[in-house]
Amino acid sequence: MTQTSKSVAEAFERASYPIPGHGPRDIQVLKEALDAYDGGLSSDKYGEGAIIEPFQERMARMLGKPAAVFFPSGTMAQQIALRIWCDAAGSKKVAYHPLSHLELHEKDGVRELHHLEPILIGDRSRPVVLADLQQLEEDVACVLLELPQREIGGQLPAYEELVKMSAYCREKGIRLHLDGARLFECLPHYGKTAAEICELFDSVYVSFYKGIGGVAGAILAGDLELTEPSTIWKRRHGGDLISLYPYILSAEYYMDRRLPLMDRYRREAQELAALYNECHAVSTTPIVPPTNMFHVRVNMPKERLEPIIVAVVEETGFGFTSYLREEKDGGCMFEVSIGDRYAELPKDQLREAFRALDRRLNPSAGRQL
């Protein structure tokens, strides 16, 4: 890590009012959750017991699937889902977006561990649509769709497009898997329940540490054709730990607390994105976020932007981001995810912080937000 990137992170750490997220990812996250439960509660053991089984049943009902299996990580859960669907079809080919988590962040796990052959579909700048599936020149066992698409700012396809893609895959005998790491965050936009969205898919993965803000863990849901072999693969991957209750209880605790707030987070993200879009040389992707997340892009090189952000943090106390990522065209970007923090921010001071940011980005303008 360079010295300049440290300065942004350090400024964010010193900020009186960090803007994104729920709060620090410290051990208080787990402690708060565990304090809500009776300390005499028996723990789960190797995938069985009074904690894990009721939670899996609850998630299966919530997602509208016959069964669900708790995993320590989504990386494990999704690779296993794709492997099972490929084995069932007698094919090694799967299709997903070029900016899928499997392609960018898993060290080629589907290739190296499972010897699958990913086919990248769609444009890097937008979600997958029906036309992308229709243009596939090879037969595939499974298509993976991510809702929302994190690496392009949380963009979502239209619900009608999802319905068309689901119908197309079923007609062609292709399994459709949902990377729903942030599924709950997109439900207010669609105006649908989790079960209504998941009905379009053969299998679904959901994360418990992103918008929900738990410690870690994931659920994989589908019919028994998927879930029964997934427990075997979970053991093969080393994921069948003697106990997973710290993950499960924190998932349950924060899910109950934050699922009712997802629409609020979305509206707050839209409010914040509007403030960013009023600033000189700044734009968000999407312009109007459909979920609680978006990307901020600044048309300025990192060596110029970084001291500006640090100065505004020190002047106003508001922390915008803990990092900047340089883009190939010379600009910078960072991701924003709205959580519990935003509602507690003093909004008049927040607007003044954005005025200060705008002034420093464009000293000659001096316009008002």
What are these regions (language model features)?
Residues 2-3, 281-369:
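Conserved C-terminal alpha-helix-loop-beta "cap" of PLP-dependent enzymes
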Residues 5, 18-73, 87, 98-103, ...:
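Conserved N-terminal alpha-helix of the aminotransferase class I/II PLP-enzyme fold
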Residues 86-141:
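PLP-dependent aminotransferase-like
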Residues 97-102, 236-237, 326:
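Short glycine-enriched loops at secondary-structure junctions
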Residues 117-118, 176-178, 320:
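Hydrophobic beta-strand scaffold residues
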Residues 126-180:
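Active-site phosphate-binding strand-loop segment of PLP-dependent enzymes
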Residues 151, 156, 199-280, 284-291, ...:
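Active-site C-terminal subdomain of aminotransferase-like
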